[in-house]
């Protein structure tokens, strides 16, 4: 327990907050060609590589991912959720934060149904998370 005198001489240190999705906290000023500290909830980017990755130890699968170059110049690895996708090398995608626990280095998700990314086909439950449209009611 510090004395009052010790606190006067050297105050309490603020805790440093470390972002879980740092690429979303940087903007880019194309006129000045410099990065800015403007955070955004989503960012647009172009796929540079699309592939599959194996998860960490207890799990086994081929998880789909894309390497994305964002509009602020940062390149990140993003997870492609849902069954099946239409992404290729120059597809324009929208990413959001949110890591995938069993994939190393994947801190972002691609938003299905945004820009070049199609929604998941034949999806009936949790449609909003996968960009699936409401099916038309069958005629009697």
From Swiss-Prot:
The modification 3-methylthioaspartic acid is found at residue 102. InterPro entries: NA-bd_OB-fold (IPR012340), Ribosomal_uS12 (IPR006032), Ribosomal_uS12_bac (IPR005679). It holds the Pfam family Ribosom_S12_S23. Disulfide bonds: none annotated. Part of the 30S ribosomal subunit. Contacts proteins S8 and S17. May interact with IF1 in the 30S initiation complex. PANTHER family: 30S RIBOSOMAL PROTEIN S12 FAMILY MEMBER. This is Small ribosomal subunit protein uS12. It comes from Geobacillus stearothermophilus.
